[in-house]
């Protein structure tokens, strides 16, 4: 696929990739969720170990300004980078990490994506290796339930024929029949990758009007006139955001065949 028209500020031809997990303790909707225990391990450690299952040997770092998180990661032998405690978002925290490292691309893995599977990470990493001139990748997945079209907690998007993300929103703007919309609208997953230059631009530029309106960070990139490449995954698992999510996640870990396989590898 031609990448003409994608964000072309990256000049790297041999990408040096890191998986980075930005983490903090003061989650508003579920305080201290980073260290919530699942099967004897903190949630963050589940995510870190899953990151290490990537087939490319890409290193996994946790970056945080919270001593509890730093200690927990170090106790398990993980790679950790100490950041300022106060950051506007995870991308800003990863930008601070990038300024201390020589990596060219950063796969940002959210610390609440406890059910991420290796093939999802590998799909993004492979795309970076094949097309390092692209500067922003975001994983997307088809919608499953019709109510996701209007559920504003589900961030959604429309794709172009070249896999470019055309627009991002919380409520579908389409007027077509629901079944047609279900075929056209995709869900944005909490897994994306970004080049060093694009990361700096995202972190240093002021928030844009649409970004503020929808509270969707990727909208800044599109508003500034740049483009995001989508990587489609056929299956998407929920993340941990609310107290009621904990029971659902626990059930999936015990009943989903692929999750059982991955869990055995990290415990």
Question: At which residue positions do the language-model features occur?
Answer:
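Short, high-confidence coil segments that cap the C-terminus of an alpha-helix
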Residues: 57, 103, 131-134, 226
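A conserved hydrophobic position in a structured secondary element of the catalytic/binding core
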Residues: 64-65, 116, 194, 241
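Conserved alpha/beta core of the MobA/IspD/sugar-nucleotide pyrophosphorylase nucleotidyltransferase superfamily
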Residues: 182-267
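Conserved core of the sugar-phosphate nucleotidyltransferase
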Residues: 117-208
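Hydrophobic/aromatic residues located in beta-strands of well-ordered beta-sheets
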Residues: 19, 59-62, 106, 136-137, ...
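Short phosphate-binding loop-to-helix
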Residues: 61, 67-126
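N-terminal glycine-rich phosphate-binding loop and ensuing alpha1 helix
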Residues: 13-64
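Short, acidic/turn-prone active-site loops that include or flank metal/cofactor-
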Residues: 25, 84-90, 235-237
């Amino acid at each position: 696929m031609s990448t003409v028209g994608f964000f072309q500020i990256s000049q790297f031809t041999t990408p040096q990739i890191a998986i980075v997990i930005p983490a903090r303790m003061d989650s508003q909707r579920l305080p201290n969720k980073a260290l919530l225990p699942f099967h004897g391990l903190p949630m963050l450690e589940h995510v870190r170990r899953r990151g290490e299952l990537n087939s490319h040997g890409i290193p996994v770092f946790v970056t945080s300004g919270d001593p509890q998180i730093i200690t927990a990661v170090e106790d398990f032998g993980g790679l950790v980078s100490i950041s300022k405690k106060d950051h506007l978002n995870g991308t800003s925290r990863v930008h601070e990490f990038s300024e201390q490292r020589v990596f060219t691309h950063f796969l940002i893995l959210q610390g609440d994506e406890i059910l991420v599977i290796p093939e999802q990470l590998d799909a993004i990493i492979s795309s970076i290796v094949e097309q390092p001139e692209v500067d922003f990748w975001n994983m997307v997945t088809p919608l499953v339930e019709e109510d996701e079209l209007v559920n504003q907690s589900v961030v959604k998007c429309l794709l172009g024929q070249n896999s470019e993300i055309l627009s991002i929103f919380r409520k579908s703007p389409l007027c077509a029949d629901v079944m047609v919309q279900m075929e056209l609208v995709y869900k944005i997953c909490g897994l994306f990758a970004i080049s060093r230059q694009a990361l700096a631009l995202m972190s240093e530029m002021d928030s844009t009007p649409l970004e503020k309106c929808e509270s969707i960070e990727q909208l800044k990139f599109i508003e500034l006139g740049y483009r995001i490449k989508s990587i489609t995954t056929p299956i998407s698992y929920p993340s941990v955001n609310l107290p009621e999510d904990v029971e659902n996640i626990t059930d999936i870990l015990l009943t989903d065949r692929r999750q059982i396989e991955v869990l055995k590898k990290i415990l």
